[in-house]
Amino acid sequence: MVVLFLIWSHVNVVVSDSMYPIMKRGDLVIVENAGFEFNPNDVDVGDIVVYKAHWPYYQYLLSEIDYKLNLNPYTTLYIFKEGDFKDMSVKVLGEIKTDKSSYKILEADIPKSPTKPVIHRVIDKVEFNNKTYFIIKGDNNPIHDPELVSINQIKQRVIVVDGHPLVIPYVGYLSIWLKEYWYLVVLFVLIYYAYNYLKGGRK
């Protein structure tokens, strides 16, 4: 069990093609863990990381906010703040300038909510209000992730060998299938037990 835990804690399943072609949906990617095998403060531009993302659950709301406030999503980043809020509210915090662009920074106050692990590449490392943040993007995506990611959100870093991420193709599809079609697994188990029950009753 310990061996299985150690193995599973060093792999992550790629669930989309946002990092295509270096990683594809269904790949199993080999990672190292923050705080144990690397210091998240040492993450730099070009690293592929796994971070705890809030934005996937608010993606459509963020698009509406950008539209209502006449914001350009290509130059907008959100810092998510969880708390005892009933609904999401947004306020402008300021602006940062990088070598690549200028970004308007907004704070999104949200109710306590789950996060989703996202495997994307760091494209910039910035300072804002005396804190270090990362701007992150999927290689195959036209735009950066809308969330300005703090150091504490970085959980894993993809292991790279000779410039290529260490992946095992297709193995992750089993995990994806079980998550997306869990109800079929439950149905199969119920049918199996019902069959055995009825079969036993006829004896």
UniProtKB/Swiss-Prot annotation:
The keyword Transferase does not apply. It comes from the Archaea. The chain crosses the membrane at residues 171-191. Disulfide bonds: none annotated. It is found in: Membrane. Keywords: Membrane, Transmembrane, Transmembrane helix. GO terms for cellular component: membrane. It is a single-pass membrane protein. GO terms for molecular function: peptidase activity; serine-type endopeptidase activity. InterPro entries: LexA/Signal_pep-like_sf, Peptidase_S26, Peptidase_S26B. One of its GO terms (biological process) is signal peptide processing. This is Uncharacterized protein MJ0260. It comes from Methanocaldococcus jannaschii (strain ATCC 43067 / DSM 2661 / JAL-1 / JCM 10045 / NBRC 100440). The lineage of its organism: Archaea, Methanobacteriati, Methanobacteriota, Methanomada group, Methanococci.
